[in-house]
Every structure is written in C-alpha cells, then in structure tokens.
Amino acid sequence: MQQSQLIKKILLTTVSLFTFMGSVYADSIGDIVESTGIGGIVRNNETLPHDIGSDIVLYDEARTGNGRMLIEFLDKEELALTEHTQVYIDEVYYDPNPSLSKMSIRMVQGTARFASGNGKKINKANIDITTPTAQIA
C-alpha cells in the first residue's frame, strides 16, 4: 500500500515538474508590433499567425514570405524582418543590469535589422547573430 502511494507521489511530482518547465519556456520575451503580408511564427512545429500583439517566446522561428514583421523584445530591442526571411530566436536573457543580458539569433535566410539602441542596451559582446555565411558576436 505504501509503495503504491509513493509511486503516485513520484508520478505526480514528475508531471508537475514537466508542466512547470513547459510554462517557463512559454514566457513571452516580446511581441509583434508591425506585420504585413504573408508570414508566421513557428512554435513547437505549429505555424501561428503573425498578428500584431502576438507573443514571441524563446525558441520561436519567425518567418516571412511576401511580407514583413517587426518584433519588439521586452527591453525595447527590435528585430525587423523583410520579405522571405527566416530567423530562429535561440537565446534571450534579460537582467536589470544590461551588461549581463544576452541575445542569440540565428538567421537562415533573408534580410533582418537588429536595433539595440532603443532599450537598456545589451552589451554588444553579449549579442550573437549567426547567418549562413558569417557570425556577428
């Protein structure tokens, strides 16, 4: 009897832990503030619309076809995507001390502009942008 209760508690704890971990990674790190034409956000293999006000979360893939998108992160940094662009948001970490904040974005194709001067200014050494032909770090 005690063994089955212990197993139930362990299972409940494990399920709770995985549920909590999923919610940690689902926290918004920014949102879409401008959107035109064709595009979307790929999250967990599901394509979501790129409507103004839609949340961006860690590990999202932002894509545009014949469209454009402007993502504003919580610290007011901006990522603007032009037509036929695909980027992965690999790491975003905010700290009250901007020199400790980090951002890592991986470009697959297209053209994007990252504006880091609007917010608390992430230390440039902590920004990593990788493209198919170069790495800006």
Could you say what each language-model-derived stretch is?
Residues 1-2, 106:
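Helix-centric, low-specificity signal for extended rod-like, repetitive segments
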